[in-house]
Amino acid sequence: MAATTFIAVDMGGYQLADALAQTRESWIMAMMTGYMAGATIVFTVPVALKMLEKRDRKYLALGVMSGLLAIPIGVFVASAVIAVSHPVIREVVSTNADATYQLALTWAQIGVNLVPLIIICVALALGLKFKPDAMIKGFIVFGRVMEGALKIVFVLVVVEYFTGLFTMVFGSFGFDPIIADEDDMFRALETAGAIGMMLCGAFPMVYLIRKYLAKPLAKIGGAVGLSSDATAGLLAGSANVLALLSMVKYLKARDKVICMAFAVCCAFLFGDHLSFTANFQPSLIVPVLLGKLAAGICAIVFVHLLAVKKAEELEAADLAAETA
């Protein structure tokens, strides 16, 4: 579970969890965690800190921390569906192996694996409730540390690729190659290329949504208390969080934190994560979708309870400072 709490499933967490898990059931629960926590920590937060304007980072912090609270619920829902349905999965990391292992996930296993997540989420909730300003500052510092660490790792990997320096000096190198090789045809550089290609469609999609779907989205959002812009943001984020991040600057503070909280659990729902699941574990598509959707809905509830009021106060303070 720890592996995919910090590393996204489709960025190496799936393979790492496979190597570390004692049972196939724990592996699959870790997979569910990685779809939400791992994707947020290793991808969404560092990328958002680069894409968003500085004044929007506090809304990112409030939204993400609120969304993290819903992750145990999403993992529980997905695991409960698995516990009831007993799907047959591929017991190795493969896109073409036969599904031969029938999962026998017990309620006791679910409870034990969720304990660390629940402890983290309770601590986050208490911090957001009683010390929101300190939590925002701490989150931004954490994001900068993550960004710096990723840059250092990138430099080390590039140096190793072109010179082999670390292998010569230390006898081995702890990180995977950055470019595809005979062992893996989809390394980090290929992942970056895939992200770039996704952006080619994501930004036009956001433009078309805002231009042609504003009225129907306003009606749909109004029924559940959301603005048309917030509804468009949720829809964009469900495909890819990059599409959502590109439209954050157009949103009100309230909508920003709602969309960011939802994205913690539901980003990539109908894009990357659906595709990854269909390729590696097609029998788990339904649990993944239900778990992420349940968590996304709960994230919206949590952000209303814990962060919307604070976001509106921060927005009012920003406006007052600009007009002063």
Segments the model singles out, each with a brief description of its role:
Residues L68-A80, N113-K129, E147-F162, A194-Y207, ...:
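Hydrophobic core segments of alpha-helical transmembrane domains in multi-pass membrane transport
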